[in-house]
Amino acid sequence: MKIPEKPIFLIFVSLILASSLTFTATAKSTIEPCSSNDTCNALLGYTLYTDLKVSEVASLFQVDPISILLANAIDISYPDVENHILPSKLFLKIPITCSCVDGIRKSVSTHYKTRPSDNLGSIADSVYGGLVSAEQIQEANSVNDPSLLDVGTSLVIPLPCACFNGTDNSLPAVYLSYVVKEIDTLVGIARRYSTTITDLMNVNAMGAPDVSSGDILAVPLSACASKFPRYASDFGLIVPNGSYALAAGHCVQCSCALGSRNLYCEPASLAVSCSSMQCRNSNLMLGNITVQQTSAGCNVTTCDYNGIANGTILTMLTRSLQPRCPGPQQFAPLLAPPDTVPRDVMYAPAPSPDFDGPGSIASSPRSSMLPGGGILPGNPANGPAGSISTASASSVSYFFITFLISIASFSLALSS
């Protein structure tokens, strides 16, 4: 009796399935445990998957478009800047609020409404640039069958973030969630963001200085911290070096100059209705500084922003005697809204000197299209450490394997 042969197509599918299972990579991300309900300012490193208006990028993450521009030191004085079209492949820092959810730090304030031809893999890998995996979206939304995704479904997009008490080596810091690209090395990432290999390894609980495409690192950016009273609604405001941030309902703009630790706030240029910004018992307005040279030194008087409470802008008059009078206030340079992405930013890896061990210090940074963090002084020690979690590096592979299993099962049924 002749033994039925297996269909050649079934054998082909089995081989592809085996190879897919063998070579599916595993991406790592840093998890920060938490037990309180406090929040912090954090950043997402996001690369545009297509040309998008500033307002469209803001809609993807449900954040203020002006805040995105200021976080990247882009000049907001240009006409109709919120509708400026940003080029595909542009890297942006997206400001978000990092919360404590189910015992770990993450942001769950982003929702995405599905469109025709969407699947969890394309949403994770393309729309959100690998900041989340298909499996994480599936779990967050209790999706039983990923292949049955109705158009118009609102999905929670759990995004990675870290707080680590807003410090790095006891200095103010904001943490950027950065998706590693194929061209990246840990040394190059450290150099780009003005930190050290040791610091990155400590923060991300890494045993070796090895990274793979799709890994998500928590990168500490040097920052300027506020000292607002706890009752202020913007208590804990912290701004990374080279960036700006809005406060008090678009009334106040705060900045952190490159290499600085001093937060400077002044009235914002936006046309909004604001409460008084004059300091009590003086004729100084928010952001004003007066100096008077004396034989004992320089008397400096400043009208500082002290947060907002119940809709009232809080100001504080500060007087100090300094050895010498300060120079003009320094600001991070503002960039014109970008229309193109330089080729070297799109394709060139971050500068990568030879690695001499975990204690190596990355040399002075070279800025990319948009400014990174400022310079962290000295060698880090005992930095914050998260834990490592793993997830499928390719959501597309996840659904491709599911598809192949279905085909294989169907072929078996036909051959039986």
Curated annotation (Swiss-Prot):
One CC-aspect GO term: side of membrane
PROSITE patterns the UniProt entry points to: LYSM
Origin: domain of life: Eukaryota
Transport among keywords: no
Signal sequence extent: 1-27
Residues listed as glycosylation sites in the UniProt record: N37, N165, N241, N288, N299, N310
LysM domain boundaries: 110-157, 176-219
Lipidation (GPI-anchor amidated alanine): A391
Propeptide: 392-416
Protein name (Swiss-Prot/TrEMBL): LysM domain-containing GPI-anchored protein 1
Pfam families in the record: LysM
Phenotype seen when the gene is deleted: Impaired sensitivity to peptidoglycans (PGNs) leading to higher susceptibility to infection with virulent Pseudomonas syringae pv. tomato DC3000.
Keyword terms, alphabetized: Cell membrane, Disulfide bond, Glycoprotein, GPI-anchor, Lipoprotein, Membrane, Plant defense, Repeat, Secreted, Signal
Keyword Transit peptide in record: no
